[in-house]
Amino acid sequence: VLSFSDQIQLPRNMIENSMFEEEPDVVDLAKEPCLHPLEPDEVEYEPRSSRLLVRGLGEHEMDDDEEDYESSAKLLGMSFMNRSSSLRNNMSVYRQSSNGSCSLPSTRTMVVCTVILVIAVALIMLIYLLPKCTFTKEGCHKKNHTMELIYPLATNGKLFPWAKIRLPSDVVPLHYDLVLQPNLTTLKFSGSVKIVVNIIQVTWKIVLHSSGLNITKATITSAGGHQEKPAEFLEYPLHDQIAVMAPEALLVGQNYTVNIEYSSNLSDTYYGFYKISYKDENSKQRWFAATQFEPVAARSAFPCFDEPAFKATFLIKIKRDEKLSTLSNMPKKATTPVANGIVQDEFFVSLKMSTYLVAFVVADLKNISRQTNASLVSVYAIPQHLNQVEYALDTSVKLLEFYQNYFLISYPLEKLDLVAIPDFQSGAMENWGLITFRESTLLFDSNTSSARDKKLITAVIAHELAHQWFGNLVTMEWWNDLWLNEGFATFMEYFAMEEIFPELHSDEDFLNLIFKAMMKDSLNSSHPVSSAVQSSEQIEEMFDALSYIKVTLKYFEIF
């Protein structure tokens, strides 16, 4: 569309309409509108230089400027005009017919309009009469008019009884009995979990998390009952959820035990219950099984209520090859033989904790230990690296004592294990009582390691030990407040280092950290430290520099 200032100049012998408004041959449409507007197909257009007759020319004579018609019409966008030379005697497309009325719409126009109207009405009726549903990757999810929720489809085609990413609050876990048997030859594992749950609202379902697990059996037992009742289970992989359907209503205030048996493969990633390989002192390939559950990978090792607010106690049993060793959050209670060189390690019942803090390791490990206050501190590594754990042990003992005195709260567990893992993606993970590290952030060789290595190891240990109080003992309710965990641990990391190891000059590093936080926060990609998150992908994105660093500015003002 051309604006007034962009209108194309007409040839100099073409006459503007406003100059001849008195011409009687012209009908002013603004004053005498037609009853039926003409369609472009019904217009018989006479190619000429202007819509007005030129004075001095006969009715059937052609102005020389008509030769410019084609170019002028194209420039003015009049491609719809009829260019037939046989119709040039009609000098005005708007000239009224002899009977004084406008042309009627053609039959073709009436037919087209009728067809369009019929199609529009049909589409409206079709949409209105369709079953109420929402279209997703799984197809049409029908609406349950009783619950007024749109339920998705489970893998077996039945309606899954929960539609939200967050778990319902009608059932809460109290305790887990977890039995695992990893096989470092086949690189698979099998397991069973018994979850004691309490019912908050009457329900027929227990919805919890499961990811990549091959579930073979599910049963429910009432608190006073001794007979397991088979239960149907539905799976909805899109939300990593399963629903155990009770054979009868689950009553408010009652405890029930859900028993689930399953199997899976050890993960190829550094997430969940995963496997890694390394070369021993004889260059022989060995396998190592470890866990990394934060933020939402506990569900890939056992069915659970995998949200930080659902704290519970854990009794963990691990079956292993008698030549290997196992570690978990709590001290080992007993080891009993099973069969064919397989033994079972049972650990003491844990304190109430979130699922992302559960951890276990199965490998060939060696350690050195030291007692401090009421806790035994141990550092583990593969045998050929045992000579590099002394500095980590000494640093851990000093930091643990400092935090207990500073917080005036004793470390609540009887042991603290620090494990160097040959291949570990994160710098470290604060699992309660079993902190896992990358080898480069825990092992220190006095012959080859630098002062920079020593500062890094000290900082990482200080950070993870701070989490034993803030994050483990006290935990955020949901991942939008991850900054409470990581921001506090980051601040205490530098604070403790300056108090205990002033020769490392961590105050200079803290100043650099503050400037880094300001720089990150000035970018368009910055976000509030507390942001609404729902999906696993959104939760993962919360683990950025802002969650770790920005909040340290506020802590610095307070302290």
Model-assigned labels for residue ranges:
Residues 240-242, 347, 379-559:
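Hydrophobic alpha-helical and helix-loop surface patches within well-folded domains
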